[in-house]
From Swiss-Prot:
GO-annotated cellular components: cytoplasm
Lineage: Bacteria, Bacillati, Bacillota, Clostridia, Eubacteriales
Protein name: Selenide, water dikinase
Family stated for the protein in its record: Belongs to the selenophosphate synthase 1 family. Class I subfamily.
Keyword Nucleotide-binding: yes
Residues at the site labelled Important for catalytic activity: 16
Length: 340
C-alpha cells in the first residue's frame, strides 16, 4: 500500500479552506430563520444548536480530513476525537455519530477497517453510539464523523460571548501542525511526534467535564485556523482579548522547528487572515507561528470569570496537566487581539 502521507497533499485540519476565503463564500449564502435554531453558521460557531423543548437542544456538527499519520488506526482515533470536540466545545454531550469515508479503490481495504476501528474506539470512550455512515471512492483517503449531541439550551457555550474581566484557559499544548509538518519532512524527533499524537488522540471530554463545574462565558476549540483566528472570533465586535505569549503551553520541539522556519502553508494563510487584527511587536517569531499553527483535535479555549479562573484552572489541570491561563478579556480596544 502506498503510504497515507505520500498519497495526500495535506493532512488534518491543515487541509481546511482558509478563514478569509471561507468567510467570502459563506457571506453569499441566504440567512435561514427558525426560532428553534439557537446557533447557526452565521456566528462561525463550532456546531449548530437546535432547540427541541425547554430543557433539550440538539447539537449537530461534521468534520473530516485526510491523514496526517501513517498508522490508520491512530488516524481514525484522531479524526473521531476532532469531530467529537465540537460538541464538547458547545457544552454538550455526544449521543451518536455517522461515519464519513472517502477511500481510494486500489488501496488495501484492511487499512480502512483499521481507520474505522480507531474511530469506533473514540466513540466508545465518549459514550456515543455509531449508527452508520456513508462511503465513496476518492483519490485520497478521508475520514471523519457527523456527530449529534445534546445540551440544555440555557447552558450553551457560545464562541463569541466573553465578558470583560474574564480570564482565558487553553487546555492543550499548541504546535501539533508544525510537528506534523516536520514528520512529513522526515525531520521530527520521536518525542515530538509522540507528544503530538497523544494530544490529538485525547478527547476534550475530560476538560469539558471539569469546566462544567464553573460559569463558562464562552468556549471554542482550537483547530485549523489556529489560536489567533479562533481568539479573534471569540472577541467578536464588543471585546478585545489580551494574550500572554509567554504563558502559552506548547510542544517544546515545535518551538525549535518554527525557529528554523519549518512552517505550514495553513499557518501562513492564518497569518494573512490576521493582518490588521493583531500587532506582533517584539513577540518572538516562533511564538507567533505557534499562535498561527493549525491544530488538529486541539484544546478548548475557555473564557471564565476572573474570580474563579484559578480554581477552574486547577480543576482542569487534573484532567489536562498542561492547561494554562493564557490571557484576559477587556473592553473593546483598537484591535480585537493584543499581545502582552
Amino acid at each position: 500500500m502506498k503510504s497515507f502521507l505520500s498519497s495526500c497533499t495535506t493532512g488534518g485540519c491543515g487541509a481546511k479552506i482558509g478563514p478569509g476565503e471561507l468567510s467570502k463564500v459563506l457571506s453569499g449564502l441566504p440567512v435561514f430563520q427558525d426560532p428553534q435554531l439557537l446557533v447557526g453558521f452565521d456566528a462561525s460557531d463550532d456546531a449548530a444548536v437546535y432547540q427541541i423543548n425547554e430543557d433539550t437542544a440538539i447539537v449537530s456538527t461534521v468534520d473530516f480530513f485526510t491523514p496526517m499519520v501513517e498508522d490508520p488506526r491512530i488516524f481514525g482515533r484522531i479524526a473521531a476525537a476532532n469531530a467529537l470536540s465540537d460538541v464538547y466545545a458547545m457544552g454538550g454531550s455526544p449521543l451518536f455519530a455517522l461515519n464519513l469515508v472517502c477511500y481510494p479503490e486500489r488501496e488495501d481495504i484492511q487499512d480502512l477497517g483499521e481507520i474505522l476501528a480507531g474511530g469506533a474506539e473514540k466513540l466508545q470512550e465518549a459514550g456515543a453510539v455509531l449508527c452508520g455512515g456513508h462511503s465513496i471512492y476518492d483519490r485520497e483517503p478521508k475520514y471523519g464523523l457527523a456527530v449529534t449531541g445534546r445540551l440544555n439550551p440555557r447552558q450553551i457555550w457560545k464562541n463569541n460571548t466573553p465578558q470583560p474581566g474574564d480570564r482565558l484557559i487553553l487546555t492543550k499544548p499548541l504546535g501539533v501542525g508544525i510537528v506534523m509538518a516536520a514528520l512529513r519532512g522526515e525531520m521530527a524527533e520521536a518525542a515530538a511526534v509522540e507528544a503530538a499524537l497523544a494530544s490529538m488522540q485525547r478527547l476534550n471530554k475530560y476538560a469539558a467535564e471539569k469546566a462544567r463545574d464553573f460559569p463558562i462565558h464562552a468556549c471554542t476549540d482550537i483547530t485549523g485556523f489556529g489560536l489567533l483566528a479562533h481568539t479573534r472570533e471569540m472577541a467578536g465586535g464588543s471585546t478585545t482579548i489580551v494574550l500572554y505569549p509567554s504563558a502559552l503551553p506548547y510542544i517544546a520541539q515545535a518551538y525549535t522547528y518554527a525557529q528554523g522556519y519549518l512552517l505550514t502553508a495553513a499557518g501562513q494563510r492564518n497569518r494573512n487572515f490576521m493582518e490588521g487584527a493583531v500587532e506582533f511587536g517584539d513577540t518572538p517569531f516562533p511564538l507567533q507561528e505557534l499562535m498561527l499553527d493549525p491544530q488538529t483535535s486541539g484544546g478548548l479555549l475557555l473564557s471564565v470569570p476572573g474570580d474563579c479562573a484559578q480554581e477552574a484552572l486547577r480543576a482542569i489541570q487534573e484532567a489536562e496537566p498542561q492547561a494554562a491561563l493564557i490571557g484576559e478579556v477587556v473592553s473593546r480596544q483598537a484591535l480585537p487581539i493584543l499581545l502582552r
